[in-house]
């Protein structure tokens, strides 16, 4: 077998399977098939798109199948032919009406999830599968935010991106102008709002208060003084009222504490005065003694000098006398044994 011509195997043919090529045949302008060019031109199944006529034929065929099922069921029940034809025609009309309302998009969107979807797609035709796949791809693109007319490598095309940017700016300006026109028309049709009565009264009060006779600072001071006087008068008027027991006890304790502190301060004032006078006299005497301190210091130094000179002799005498002045050690452990009794003289 050579170039797709001949038998797949020479077994049983009685020949060696050699096929001689025809060199006299020459095909001018024949283009060699390339896989890359074929995929670019044709594309995948989703790029081709389903055939609308085939899909319409499949839907009509499903209608006729249901009508035939009804006819067979009625014939098995021994129903009259006229009644069978009438009921089948009625079913066909209702199904055709539903078919007219149902579009390709709705038919593609009505699919199940999970195993039911897989089985339904498996039993579908090629064009129905392509239609359902296109619908799913469109839904995914909307969820991700990809435009409908997207093409590969459009993001690297600067001219196209500038054109899209200018179109977006133009659309935004048009939308802004439309909003402004709508607001202007709404404002022109709506009557102006009437000012409330309070605003006019407050305005009149403000105009009357801003009179040139009284400057603003004096008016502010007079207002603060009037507020203080009103607060004092309200406190004086509120004093005769019976306060709560908690506040009365607090006030009574505070007044008793203040009276005790005052009496203590008064009783202690003579002592403090006497103490302050004593401290003043002591400070004066100290200052006088400090002023006389140089002479006393010189005298004390003179008086102390002989004592310092005599100190070695005293130290020596104290050292020599130190054994006598030392305290005796009580030796309780070393006790002398009792000696013999005294002897009487022989003459007695």
Swiss-Prot record:
Residues 275-291, 322-332 have a biased composition (Basic residues). Gene3D superfamilies: 6.10.140.420. Residues 81-106 form a coiled coil. Belongs to the CWC21 family. Pfam families: cwf21. This is Pre-mRNA-splicing factor CWC21. Keywords: Coiled coil, Cytoplasm, mRNA processing, mRNA splicing, Nucleus, Spliceosome. Residues 101-112 have a biased composition (Polar residues). Residues 101-135, 168-348 are annotated as: Disordered. GO terms for biological process: mRNA processing; RNA splicing. Disulfide bonds: none annotated. Associates with the NTC complex (or PRP19-associated complex). The NTC complex associates with the spliceosome after the release of the U1 and U4 snRNAs and forms the CWC spliceosome subcomplex reminiscent of a late-stage spliceosome. Involved in pre-mRNA splicing. May function at or prior to the first catalytic step of splicing at the catalytic center of the spliceosome. May do so by stabilizing the catalytic center or the position of the RNA substrate. It comes from Mycosarcoma maydis. Residues 172-184, 197-212, 223-260, 308-321 have a biased composition (Low complexity).
């Amino acid at each position: 077998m050579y170039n797709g011509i001949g038998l797949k195997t020479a077994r049983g043919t009685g020949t060696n399977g050699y096929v001689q090529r025809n060199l006299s045949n020459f095909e001018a302008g024949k283009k060699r098939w390339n896989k890359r060019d074929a995929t670019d031109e044709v594309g995948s199944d989703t790029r081709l798109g389903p055939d609308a006529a085939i899909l319409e034929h499949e839907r009509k065929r499903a209608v006729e199948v249901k009508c035939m099922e009804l006819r067979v069921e009625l014939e098995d029940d021994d129903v009259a032919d006229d009644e069978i034809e009438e009921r089948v025609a009625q079913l066909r009309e209702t199904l055709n009406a539903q078919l007219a309302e149902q579009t390709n998009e709705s038919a593609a969107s009505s699919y199940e999830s999970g195993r039911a979807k897989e089985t339904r797609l498996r039993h579908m035709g090629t064009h129905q599968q392509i239609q359902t796949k296109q619908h799913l791809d469109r839904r995914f693109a909307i969820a991700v935010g990809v435009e409908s007319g997207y093409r590969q490598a459009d993001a690297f095309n600067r001219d196209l991106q500038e054109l899209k940017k200018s179109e977006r700016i133009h659309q935004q300006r048009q939308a802004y102008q439309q909003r402004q026109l709508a607001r202007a028309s709404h404002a022109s049709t709506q009557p102006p709002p009437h000012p409330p009565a309070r605003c006019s009264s407050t305005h009149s009060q403000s105009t009357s208060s801003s009179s040139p006779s009284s400057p603003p600072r004096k008016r502010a001071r007079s207002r603060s003084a009037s507020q203080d006087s009103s607060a004092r008068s309200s406190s004086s008027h509120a004093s005769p009222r019976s306060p709560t027991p908690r506040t009365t006890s607090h006030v009574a304790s505070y007044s008793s504490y203040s009276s005790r502190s005052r009496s203590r301060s008064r009783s202690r004032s003579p002592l403090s005065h006497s103490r302050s006078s004593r401290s003043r006299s002591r400070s004066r005497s100290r200052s006088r003694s400090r002023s006389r301190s140089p002479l006393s210091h010189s005298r004390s130094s003179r008086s102390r000098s002989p004592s310092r000179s005599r100190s070695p002799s005293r130290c020596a005498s104290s050292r020599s006398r130190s054994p006598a002045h030392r305290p005796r050690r009580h030796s309780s452990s070393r006790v002398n044994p009792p000696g013999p009794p005294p002897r009487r003289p022989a003459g007695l």
